[in-house]
Design a protein with these regions (language model features):
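Receiver (REC) domain active-site loop signature in two-component systems and cognate sites
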Residues: 83
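Alpha4 helix (beta4-alpha4-beta5 surface) of REC/receiver domains from two-component response regulators
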Residues: 90-94, 101, 110-132
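Acidic catalytic/metal-coordinating carboxylates
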Residues: 60-61, 87-93
């Protein structure tokens, strides 16, 4: 019988700035991705890579992301709403309590009403919501939200 090795709850995604779109002295914008789906994290990473210089850190669960917030100090948080253990709304509330004041992009396969309610809640607790999108997110939607 083979033993199953536990999988880490996070992985770091180094980003190489696209020299054609970034000024040479521009520091990469720090982004924290939070989604319990590895495929979605990879898809978001690939899109961000096309948009410019980003220092991306990805987390598969909200509790690990909360621990990473002060260390990574992201400018932008891209967050799923439907996750096990701690959902995106609980995560956003905890992030606000920790003092996170960066921009937020919400992504979810949940219905529009849930995304709209989450957007209003995030704004009510002082977060800057740059967008709320249905999964899978279109690249152009994400580009506009990231650039605002």
């Amino acid at each position: 019988m083979a033993l199953v090795q536990p999988q880490p709850s996070f992985f770091y995604i180094p980003m190489t700035p696209d020299s054609s779109s970034a000024s040479p002295d521009a520091a990469p914008q720090r982004v924290l991705l939070l989604d319990d789906d590895r495929f979605m994290l990879a898809m978001l990473r690939d899109m961000l890579e096309d948009f410019g210089p980003f220092d991306v850190h990805a987390e598969l669960d909200a509790r690990s992301a909360l621990a990473e917030l002060p260390r990574h100090a992201p400018h932008l948080l891209i967050c799923d709403l439907a996750m096990p253990d701690m959902d995106g709304i609980e995560f956003l509330q905890a992030a606000a309590v920790q003092g996170f004041r960066g921009r937020v992009i919400l992504v979810s396969a949940l219905e529009d009403g849930v995304r709209n309610a989450a957007t209003e809640l995030a704004r009510a607790i002082g977060l800057q919501v740059a967008g709320a999108f249905r999964k899978p997110v279109a690249a152009e939607q994400l580009r506009r939200a990231v650039q605002c």
